[in-house]
Swiss-Prot record:
PROSITE patterns per the UniProt record, alphabetical: P_GLUCOSE_ISOMERASE_1, P_GLUCOSE_ISOMERASE_2, P_GLUCOSE_ISOMERASE_3
An annotated Gene Ontology molecular function: monosaccharide binding
Predominant subcellular localization, coarse grouping: cytoplasm
Cellular compartment(s): Cytoplasm
Pfam families: PGI
Similarity comment: Belongs to the GPI family.
Organism: Thiobacillus denitrificans (strain ATCC 25259 / T1)
Leading EC class: isomerase
Pathway: Carbohydrate biosynthesis; gluconeogenesis; Carbohydrate degradation; glycolysis; D-glyceraldehyde 3-phosphate and glycerone phosphate from D-glucose: step 2/4
Protein name per the record: Glucose-6-phosphate isomerase 1
Length: 550
């Protein structure tokens, strides 16, 4: 593996960037009537318009060449054939296999991948259908009406995002809720709405040792037992998504009601596995299969389309262009679709936990920027919160806008305004508004020339600010599957270019190691352990507030 900055394509991009410093997208559109057609791409019903970027066709050729020299195609094939590309944990990365309708024969760690996936999916389907048709009943014989998914990180963010996004497709009589935070108000607020006799809990923890998940699960069990007063009730009101049968059984869950997943499925890529049980319970098995099919359609596109016409590659390489040549630190994601209100938190984990790394595959510190800060909110809420910064701030912020052509509610006029606002924002970012135009408008409105000159600079929109637009027909399960897989593969592309491991997450470990002694120090008779001055001071203040000695 050659160092990234020594690759010929990288050096060519450095030279090309010098000629692009003053590139004006407005002029590019004036000079090229076909720019939209040239710099847009379709996959199924999904349209990516990337023409509003500071790129030319030459830029895109250089970026595709960088992908080739970085051996992106080889790494993509290695992932899909079960090689251990998660090299720090010596694991394969096979979330793509979970959504393939026909899986090639593949053995990983002595496990027949196709057979194992098929077996778990079959068990999931039977369970989902038993809840929906009423044959699975609670301890007192009542059917299940509410499901509470207890998990954190990938066991929560993905399923919660999908369930909110596809709420229009929810089955009747079963509602799914999500609890993740260790803060007791999260669980208490959820349980306050529910009837223990008709509530099912899903405990999602691969090891069945995750602190936050087990704390919430034990509290939920205590709530259930306080109401039903029968220890055997746990078996009818709890199921587990785990690999630790012994711990699951000790909790009181029948191991027959444990759905497994594997080390080659990372948490932030796990909604396609048994972790997606809550999704299937919310939208039904057929719609869950449509979600998988949409993701598979994007997988096929990613594996087969040439780099120059490959949607995840284009999105990923545009991110490289801005982060490593234009010096951007963030990118904004703005879904003009309220159902996608949890997409940004999901993408924050997907992107920042995957590519927030500073050591490369050669175990060396990198000398370039890697994962960006991901942020955003649904439109039009974001317009009234932070778009001032995007339009008029001092930082260049690449952005993604997502919007459906057709809404699923009867309020069609509101959707027309939503669509109009989405397109207007991307146009405003591109075109901007000059001081001369603003002065003329102010004078025409009756303002004096001097006052107009004084106010105009504050109303200037510089324009020439980049954005991508992802347009889809409607937000159905298949389309959502495509969108999620698109961003998964985009993150993979960038990790390959940056020569980092996108599939481990060591950054979460240190805080977890430091928490137990701090917890002990907060409530013990005497302060235990040594801490830095700031942490020691905070512990002492908490102890004083609790009436403990310091």
């Amino acid at each position: 593996m050659k160092p990234l900055k020594t690759l010929p394509a990288w050096k060519a991009l450095e030279q090309h960037f010098k000629s692009m410093r003053n590139f004006d997208m407005r002029a590019a559109f004036r000079e090229d009537a076909a720019r939209f057609e040239t710099l847009s791409l379709r996959c199924g019903n999904l349209l990516l318009d990337y023409s509003k970027n500071r790129v030319t066709q030459e830029t895109m050729r250089h970026l595709a060449q960088l992908a080739r020299e970085s051996e992106l195609e080889e790494m993509r094939n290695a992932m899909c054939t079960g090689e251990r590309i998660n090299f720090t944990e010596k694991r394969a990365v096979l979330h793509v296999a979970l959504r393939a309708p026909v899986r090639p024969a593949l053995m990983v760690e002595g496990v027949d991948v196709e057979r194992e996936i098929a077996k778990v999916l079959h068990r999931m389907q039977r369970f989902v259908e038993s809840v929906h048709n009423g044959s699975w009943r609670g301890h007192t014989g009542k059917p299940i009406r509410n499901v509470v998914n207890i998990g954190i990180g990938g066991s929560d963010l993905g399923p919660a995002m999908v369930c909110h996004a596809l709420d229009h497709y929810a089955v009747e009589n079963v509602r799914v809720h999500f609890v993740s935070n260790l803060d007791p108000s999260h669980l208490a607020g959820t349980l306050a709405q529910l009837d223990p006799e008709t509530t099912l809990f899903i405990v999602a923890s691969k090891t069945f040792t995750t602190l936050e998940t087990l704390a919430n699960a034990n509290s939920a069990k205590a709530w259930l037992l306080a109401a039903l007063r029968a220890p055997e009730a746990v078996a009818r009101h709890f199921v587990a998504l785990s690999t630790n049968a012994q711990a699951v059984e000790a909790f009181g869950i029948d191991p027959e009601n444990m759905f497994i997943f594997w080390d080659w499925v990372g948490g932030r890529y796990s909604l396609w596995s048994a972790i997606g049980l809550s999704i299937a319970l919310q939208i039904g098995w057929g719609n869950f299969q449509a979600l998988l099919a949409g993701a598979h359609a994007m997988d096929v596109h990613f594996k087969e389309a040439p780099l120059e016409a490959n949607m995840p590659v284009i999105l990923g390489m545009l991110g490289i262009w801005y982060a490593n040549f234009w010096g951007t630190d963030t990118y904004g994601v703005f879904p003009y679709d309220q159902r996608l209100r949890l997409l940004v938190p999901f993408l924050q984990q997907l992107d920042m936990e995957s590519n927030g790394k500073n050591v490369n595959r050669a175990n060396k510190l990198v000398n370039y920027n890697t994962g960006p800060i991901v942020w955003g909110a649904p439109g039009t809420n974001g317009q009234h919160a932070f778009f001032e910064l995007v339009h008029q701030g001092t930082r260049l912020i690449p952005t993604d806008f997502l919007v459906a052509a057709v809404n699923l509610t009867p309020l069609a006029d509101q959707h027309e305004w939503l669509l109009a606002n989405c397109l207007a924002q991307t146009e405003a970012l591109l075109k901007g508004k000059s001081r001369a135009v603003i002065e003329a408008e102010l004078i025409a409105q009756g303002m004096t020339r001097d006052d107009a000159r004084a106010l105009a600079p504050h109303k200037v929109f510089p324009g020439n600010r980049p954005s991508n637009t992802l347009l889809y027909q409607k937000l159905d399960p298949h389309t959502l599957g495509m969108l999620i897989a698109l961003y998964e593969h985009k993150v993979f592309v960038q990790g390959v270019i940056w020569q980092i491991n996108s599939f481990d997450q060591w950054g979460v470990e240190l805080g977890k190691q430091l928490a137990p002694p701090i917890r002990a120090a907060l409530s013990s008779v005497r302060v235990i352990g040594e801490h830095d001055g700031s942490t020691q001071g905070l512990i002492a203040d908490i102890r004083r507030r609790r009436g403990l000695s310091t």
